[in-house]
Amino acid sequence: MTSQRTRERLIQRLYEEGLSNARVLEVIRRTPRHLFVDEALAHRAYEDTALPIGHNQTISQPFMVARMTELLLAAGPLDKVMEIGTGSGYQTAVLAQLVERVFSVERIQALQDKAKERLAELNLRNVVFRWGDGWEGWSALAPYNGIIVTAAASEVPQSLLDQLAPGGRLVIPVGGGEVQQLMLIVRTEDGFSRQVLDSVRFVPLLNGPIA
């Protein structure tokens, strides 16, 4: 089912789980998640669960998309955000409706090609894509006010810290095991502040682009 009622049920569940940013919840409500999964899984698109998208990757559960987006925007609007891990393009689409410009990096070209098509179908034109290694980020267009990483890094990549603007926020799952820690890192005048927030489960952030 992809009816409005199933979407409303999802939003109510996210609200009950403690998510409260009205703008983020409204974007989740109106973004057609069923377009970002294979047709065979479309009936499960509005369940609060991660779903496979091929290439050993998943579309993140809506709670985690909303949670990470809330953390990114908690200090106010952002005009320039880098996303590491385009994946299905769902998180990208959510960001594109909340920030001025999104720069999205994906190592698996086939996934990114599909994501481009989906965002074009939704007429989201403020996203620029790069096929490449997420560990490296996109230094040519740095700095960024916000960086969001949708796969778990074994450690925080120094290259991403270097590409964060003063006052910028990095939301990233960190850890090499089955369960990782969601971290919020903010660039301050004299370095970086780091907060460990939630225990999470993400696919690993891998090196090297794949055609």
Swiss-Prot record:
- Which SUPFAM superfamilies does the entry mention? S-adenosyl-L-methionine-dependent methyltransferases
- Keyword check for Transport, yes or no: no
- Spell out the molecular function terms from Gene Ontology: protein-L-isoaspartate (D-aspartate) O-methyltransferase activity
Chief subcellular location equals: cytoplasm
Q: Which GO terms describe its cellular component?
A: cytoplasm
Catalysed reactions listed for this entry: [protein]-L-isoaspartate + S-adenosyl-L-methionine = [protein]-L-isoaspartate alpha-methyl ester + S-adenosyl-L-homocysteine
Example of a GO biological process term:
methylation
Question: Where is this protein found?
Answer: Cytoplasm
Q: Which residues carry out catalysis?
A: 60
UniProt-listed PROSITE patterns: PCMT
This protein is called what? Protein-L-isoaspartate O-methyltransferase
